[in-house]
């Protein structure tokens, strides 16, 4: 009997704690009492949210930044393994392009962060190999040598510039030695009159490529994002030929890419006592009041070993705000309980993009076997292939332990989803990081099996990794490493809706998932969308006080 009374008491306690509900009628929303009142609420502490907060640091208004987990940075995630503590591993974004990523370049300078050369770039000639259809090929062989594809004579002549050739055949546009702009790409038509963006990769290349030529173009692209399913054909040409990728040096931040949002938030917090940051807050719902303010309903979360859990038994926190910036991935945004997001106008706009899973697996070894000419004839700092590991990058040597680090797999799409299944099977390997970042025996074996094929060595000769860590960009709130634009959608037709889904509400959306083409997979895309929204709707809040402008003029 005592046990039954205890259980009843616990039920009453939990019910009373979680008894706050999201208001449903206009009257109940107007009557809602707030636990906290702000001028501006920013939800999401990734690059776009951190940048938005930073730009408003001098606003003099009550600005709150809320983050789902216990970590700021979003898809910028710098990590250190215990045996290589002096080397930053980038589990998310790892580089940027000077001359193309101008906002990020300026922000790093403004924050006093040091940028250094990203050694391998995108795979440098002489240091990069491809493993295609079971054959190991040098970069030069892929460009102009024998490849295991039955290309036509004209495709063979254009092997090293296959995308330039196909674009000209499709649309008549000759790129020459230059690049192509977004505006130009979106106006291009194929021979039957259709706009190029209305076609998928397969539909477009079927018009001009041989079956083998199409597969060659697909495989040398490596990433699945732009060349599978309903991906917009413009995306792959933008990736190879667009002006957004045409820059100078490829750099990274010496202190780690995550240092950028960390420093942005640090500056935001220290500038004013009215600027605040709250971690481990899950935004469950938004409701409007008659006075055009908003009630944001947050549920506390808990993060352990990289996995964040929503604490459903904890009461909702009600935060009221006059304006809201949702710096959320589209995966999380579409799951938010806010009625305007689920109306036709917004639903149509967000349907323009598709989530693309992405992943990285780092391993450390006591020898750099992939660079040892006594071990393999196929030595390479970077290997790209049509196998589940997709891409492998040499990642330096630790001066602390002398151990060597490898991105053993950098994958997207179905390769990532397959590897995630393997990650969730079996025991963790010795030296694996815990929780969401673990590397299992099946995952390790699959990656090393395929790497042994690419390097032409017996699997048994590859040493066991000393430590390992994985990151799968598949779960809430991210749902993906980046997005791809679906065929049939014109960016300019949906961009304004994506960034302001309801014209009568001051709720705005920022982040890389709402940026154009190639930029959607870069930090620059997150900063671009934030910059655009801030310039359109928050000019006053982003203005520097006169004293700051005066100081800057003497420091330039």
Curated annotation (Swiss-Prot):
Homotetramer. To A.fulica achacin protein. GO terms for molecular function: L-amino-acid oxidase activity. It comes from Aplysia kurodai. One of its GO terms (biological process) is amino acid catabolic process. Residues 1-19 form the signal peptide. This is Aplysianin-A. The keyword Lyase does not apply.
